[in-house]
């Protein structure tokens, strides 16, 4: 189904924005992408998200929806006829939300400490990050995707962060594949979907952004 009047305010390296690019692609929704400069936020961004003043923001029929997991659910509910992301079973749906929330609370903040940290702080962050990934790998088990046989809510919530894996590994000198081989296989399976592969920047491009950011923050 095509949709009219859908705008996504986004920033290309944002894993949270990537989630929505994937979901919109899976659903076949046409939209206008507006790239934001986070050091000089647009009047539209400030108007549409006056509380947090953050991207991503989905604007649908002139109404703003904020916070990426909330937007993911909105997309799934509004365009429910293609590629459902959340399971129909209430218990399974609650579990998908639990793991997506776990990803939100753990991956970004710990990952940031991995690429930006030094010495003991970085080593501690790396240890924590690996434990988080191992917890997620345990939940994945022997399934193809987190929800079973089809790409779903938890996959879309997590897979954008895999575009940052190279940066984490390079900055902190470790191998995610050595620690969590099943998770890396899962990531490669997700990337077989064009909706995923075309929505994620190349890991080397992300690494270039990380180096620029470290320099800007005086961490280089």
Swiss-Prot record:
One of its GO terms (biological process) is glutathione metabolic process. It catalyses: RX + glutathione = an S-substituted glutathione + a halide anion + H(+). Glutathione binds at residues 14, 41, 55, 67-68. GO terms for cellular component: cytoplasm. Keywords: Auxin signaling pathway, Transferase. It comes from the Eukaryota. Residues 4-83 form the GST N-terminal domain. Induction: By auxin. One of its GO terms (molecular function) is glutathione transferase activity. Residues 89-209 form the GST C-terminal domain. Its EC number is 2.5.1.18. It is an enzyme of class 2 (transferase). PROSITE patterns: GST_CTER (PS50405), GST_NTER (PS50404). The keyword Transmembrane helix does not apply. Belongs to the GST superfamily. HSP26 family. This is Probable glutathione S-transferase parA. It comes from Nicotiana tabacum. The lineage of its organism: Eukaryota, Viridiplantae, Streptophyta, Embryophyta, Tracheophyta.
């Amino acid at each position: 189904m095509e949709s009219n009047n859908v705008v996504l305010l986004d920033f290309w390296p944002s894993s949270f924005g990537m989630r929505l690019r994937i979901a919109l692609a899976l659903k076949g929704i046409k939209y206008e992408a507006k790239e934001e400069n986070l050091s000089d936020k647009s009047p539209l961004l400030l108007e549409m998200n006056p509380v947090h003043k953050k991207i991503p923001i989905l604007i649908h029929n002139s109404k703003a929806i904020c916070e990426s997991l909330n937007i993911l659910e909105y997309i799934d509910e509004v365009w429910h006829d293609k590629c459902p992301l959340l399971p129909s079973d209430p218990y399974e749906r609650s579990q998908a939300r639990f793991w997506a929330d776990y990803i939100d609370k753990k991956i970004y903040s710990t990952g940031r400490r991995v690429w930006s940290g030094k010495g003991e702080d970085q080593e501690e962050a790396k240890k924590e990050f690996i434990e988080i990934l191992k917890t997620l790998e345990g939940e994945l088990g022997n399934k193809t995707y987190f929800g079973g046989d089809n790409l779903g809510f938890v996959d879309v919530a997590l897979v954008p962060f895999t575009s940052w894996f190279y940066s984490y590994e390079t900055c902190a000198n470790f191998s995610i594949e050595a620690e969590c081989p099943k998770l890396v296989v899962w990531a490669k399976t997700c990337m077989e979907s064009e909706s995923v592969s075309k929505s994620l920047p190349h890991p080397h491009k992300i690494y270039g952004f990380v180096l620029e950011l470290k320099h800007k923050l005086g961490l280089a």
